[in-house]
């Protein structure tokens, strides 16, 4: 196994210390007041739901998945088009209909917030059969409910990948949300026939001036690796702070045998 930590010279890098000014973990077990769920399919068969249950599976009752193991656990938002399309993906494709749908928050007040970071945890599995031109898991941000800035949060996860741990997503949405009184968030499954998307622990925070996030290991799989002396370890870092990083910093990787690898960036 591999544990990667990160030190930023002269600055503090601690994502958990950020203070959120808005958060929703769905612990009430129902859709929050003022939120909306929209099914954009022609047959109106697919809708986001608030649930604490697993994805029940499809295609001869296979492809099941447990509920997202988010920080808050329990209730979360779940979209499960695979249950509806099942073995009839070809028929859906022939009639040019995708099981698209989204949920949207009520207005969030971001006045006085010069920088805004959207954080959430999600778990998904997708099928690349007959995907549409705008296929993706899209998070939209708007300050008027009409015009949207969208981010595809599939994170280049290959089709049919079974994720076991939630993806911790962080997006700096300051260009749309900073100092705006009516900010809306939208989570939109678009132009993919199956399987599911689970979302939980959505929050808005103010970023530190200098703050780096370690997104993922890019040279190897996240788990189950055996490293040799010839291996080159590569990771993807993301600046989620409000200011550019203009100082060198050190990335340290700790192997489970106690060995440490370091690199200056």
Predicted regions and their residues:
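Bacterial Sec-dependent N-terminal signal peptides
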Residues: 1-21, 206
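Extracellular glycan-recognition surfaces and repeat-rich motifs
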Residues: 19-88
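Extracellular beta-strand-rich recognition modules
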Residues: 26, 103-106, 110-127, 137, ...
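Short beta-strands within extracellular/lumenal beta-sheet-rich domains
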Residues: 90-113, 167-170
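Extracellular carbohydrate recognition
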Residues: 96-102, 130-132, 190-207
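Conserved Ser/Thr-centered positions that define the repeating blades of beta-propeller domains
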Residues: 105, 140-142, 254
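Extracellular/luminal regions of secreted and cell-surface proteins that mediate adhesion/ECM remodeling
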Residues: 153-156, 199-265
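Terminal, low-complexity interaction segments
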Residues: 157-204
């Amino acid at each position: 196994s591999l544990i990667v930590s990160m030190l930023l010279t002269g600055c503090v890098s601690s994502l958990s210390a950020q203070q959120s000014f808005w958060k929703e973990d769905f612990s009430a077990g129902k859709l929050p007041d003022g939120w909306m769920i929209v099914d954009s399919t022609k047959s109106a068969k697919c809708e986001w739901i608030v649930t604490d249950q697993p994805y029940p599976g499809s295609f001869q009752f296979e492809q099941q998945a447990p509920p997202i193991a988010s920080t808050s656990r329990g209730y979360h938002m779940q979209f499960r088009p695979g249950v509806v399309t099942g073995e009839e993906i070809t028929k859906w494709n022939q009639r040019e209909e995708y099981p698209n749908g989204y949920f949207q928050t009520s207005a969030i007040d971001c006045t006085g917030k010069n920088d805004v970071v959207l954080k959430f945890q999600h778990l998904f599995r997708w099928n690349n059969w007959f995907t549409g031109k705008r296929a993706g898991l899209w998070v939209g941000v708007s300050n008027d409910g009409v015009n949207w800035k969208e981010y595809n949060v599939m994170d280049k996860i290959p089709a049919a990948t079974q994720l076991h741990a939630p993806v911790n997503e962080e997006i700096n949405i300051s260009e749309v949300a900073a100092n705006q009184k009516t900010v809306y968030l939208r989570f939109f499954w678009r132009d993919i026939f199956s399987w599911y998307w689970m979302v939980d622990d959505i929050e808005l925070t103010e970023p530190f001036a200098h703050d780096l996030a370690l997104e993922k290991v890019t040279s190897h799989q996240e788990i189950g690796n055996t490293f040799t002396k010839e291996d080159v370890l590569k990771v993807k870092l993301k600046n989620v702070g409000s200011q550019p990083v203009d100082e060198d910093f050190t990335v340290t990787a700790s192997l489970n045998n106690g060995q440490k690898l370091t690199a200056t960036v």
